[in-house]
């Protein structure tokens, strides 16, 4: 049956990692917040993700920065009880830890160091992408982060998690849409 709708299909050969399941869940959570335009997840399986098609416009991505900034401010008002997400997910193809701090602390600097920096560094070590000098520098950074971020008193909030110019688009009406989150 041809409904006349156009879709966007992301597909991989081996869907065993769970990346599309995580991406679909992240898109749904962002969509529920209603703060930013998010494409509808039409269907999802281990090796595919089917999304509504967004017709891209010809406007520069710079043209919507103010609107996107206001939308992010609204999104970041959606608070949770803890930093993280109910399940681990992916930053691209790389596993991302979202579990609460192993020290029981529920502050942003601790979560950021343990779940973002140290976790990704451990993957780099495991895969042979680092050396002792870099590891020593990272240890210095881990110890400096709490001081650098002191006084921020950030509350847990819903984040896109992988924002860069390739993960948002501008539709034909000049409105921004977010894609490919790592919430």
Cite the ranges covered by each PLM segment.
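Generic structural signal for small/hydrophobic residues in well-ordered secondary structure
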Residues: 27, 112, 163, 180-181
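Conserved catalytic-loop position in the HRD/HxD motif
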Residues: 157, 162, 167
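A generic beta-sheet turn/junction motif
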Residues: 2, 34, 163, 172-174
């Amino acid at each position: 049956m041809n409904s006349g709708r156009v879709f966007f299909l992301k597909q991989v050969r081996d869907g065993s990692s769970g990346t599309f399941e995580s991406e679909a869940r992240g898109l749904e959570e962002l969509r529920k917040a209603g703060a930013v335009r998010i494409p509808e997840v039409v269907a999802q399986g281990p090796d595919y993700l089917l999304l509504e098609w967004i017709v891209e416009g010809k406007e520069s991505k710079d043209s919507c920065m103010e609107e996107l900034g206001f939308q992010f401010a609204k999104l970041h008002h959606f608070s949770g009880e803890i930093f993280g997400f109910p399940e681990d997910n992916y930053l691209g193809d790389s596993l991302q830890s979202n579990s609460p701090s192993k020290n029981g602390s529920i502050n942003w600097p601790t979560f950021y160091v343990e779940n973002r920096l140290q976790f990704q560094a451990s993957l780099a070590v495991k895969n042979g992408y680092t050396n002792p000098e870099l590891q020593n520098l990272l240890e210095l950074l881990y110890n400096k982060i709490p001081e650098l971020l002191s006084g921020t008193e950030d509350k847990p909030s819903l984040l896109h998690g992988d924002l860069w110019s390739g993960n948002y688009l501008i539709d034909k009406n000049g409105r921004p849409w977010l894609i490919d989150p790592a919430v």
